[in-house]
Amino acid sequence: MSLTRKPLASHHRIVIKIGSALLVDRKSGLKKDWLDAICEDIAALKKNGADVQVVSSGAIALGRTVLGLPSGALKLEESQAAAAVGQIALARAWSESLSRHEIVAGQILLTLSDTEERRRYLNARATINQLLKIGAIPIINENDTVATTEIRYGDNDRLAARVATMTGADLLVLLSDIDGLYTAPPHLDPDAKFLETIADITPEIEAMAGGAASELSRGGMRTKIDAGKIATAAGCGMIIASGKTLNPLKAIENGARSSWFAPSGTPVTARKTWIAGQLQPAGEIHVDAGAEKALYAGKSLLPAGVRQVKGNFGRGDAIAIIGVEGREVARGLAGYDAEEARLIIGHKSNEIETILGYVGRAAMIHRDDLVMTGAAVKVKHAKKDEVHA
């Protein structure tokens, strides 16, 4: 794992997430000057050979401004109506600003199932890759006109992380009104320290995340840390930076303060990237210390090391594996459904046939269907890097 931050222009594929408050003003609507300025930055990156994708918030915020909806929380149907109006205006604005640099914009609206269901995930990835291949800039947003409260990303930070892992990006940049991660909310604690480099997203780092989002947006530092966990586990670095200034990407290149989250040093297969990035695991499997150690050694998860099964999942569903400290250590595809899994926990693999009445798999989750997650993975690989240094 390398903690060295490279210039933006040296990255091959970059995902830029833009918060609603940067694009939309409650009174005046779209911030056209700001949009034109960041399109200058994007054009410069593209000219240097980088593939650039934009995850743009702002559809609901822009739509509610156009419709003159009152301040305060919106009902689901009001949000969907605002999104329907705002998506048209937002796409047009991006297209016009990028066209000044002879760049074509392509709009992609995603729902949670587009990244959680394998076939739709592959289709979405193919579409984005084709847009990049022909030189277009994908402008991506959650399809808020059809997303429901129960089935949605809920914020564009995590959506951006999923897009980054889905398309093999090596850098994710989260632009908002926050310039990075502090040890505590700086407006509440004058002694809060700014963190320029985050090597691992540990429980201590997670505890630092907090604070409510603005009325125009749904994200906060909590969702940015969640995004960092998704991105860095897939080998993608992440930057949290303020976008309040014009040309914010150029500002980052020129040394403006921002927080850098180092990627894990081990690229994983596309299939395992998809498994690791699942936002809604169908269930949980809690394991003992011996099983947890075996997982870190690259072994499959056997029934003997399982202590508890939670949830109602089917065979092939993505599930979270919880270690002895109560934190997620891995994710994988279930080799058994929840009912069968509960019957065989704590038993040896050679006892499965007697219990279930048929010859089943020896592993609860096979190592080919399993990927380690969390800071412990990075610590492990960092030690390996030290050995080989």
UniProtKB/Swiss-Prot annotation:
It is found in: Cytoplasm. It is an enzyme of class 2 (transferase). Substrate binds at residues 57, 144, 156. The gene is proB. It comes from Agrobacterium fabrum (strain C58 / ATCC 33970) (Agrobacterium tumefaciens (strain C58)). The lineage of its organism: Bacteria, Pseudomonadati, Pseudomonadota, Alphaproteobacteria, Hyphomicrobiales. InterPro entries: AceGlu_kinase-like_sf (IPR036393), Asp/Glu/Uridylate_kinase (IPR001048), G5K_ProB (IPR041739), Glu/AcGlu_kinase (IPR001057), Glu_5kinase (IPR011529), Glu_5kinase/COase_Synthase (IPR005715), Glutamate_5-kinase_CS (IPR019797), PUA (IPR002478). ATP binds at residues 17, 176-177. One of its GO terms (molecular function) is RNA binding. It catalyses: L-glutamate + ATP = L-glutamyl 5-phosphate + ADP. Belongs to the glutamate 5-kinase family. Pathway: Amino-acid biosynthesis; L-proline biosynthesis; L-glutamate 5-semialdehyde from L-glutamate: step 1/2. Keywords: Amino-acid biosynthesis, ATP-binding, Cytoplasm, Kinase, Nucleotide-binding, Proline biosynthesis, Transferase. Its EC number is 2.7.2.11. Its main location: cytoplasm. This is Glutamate 5-kinase.
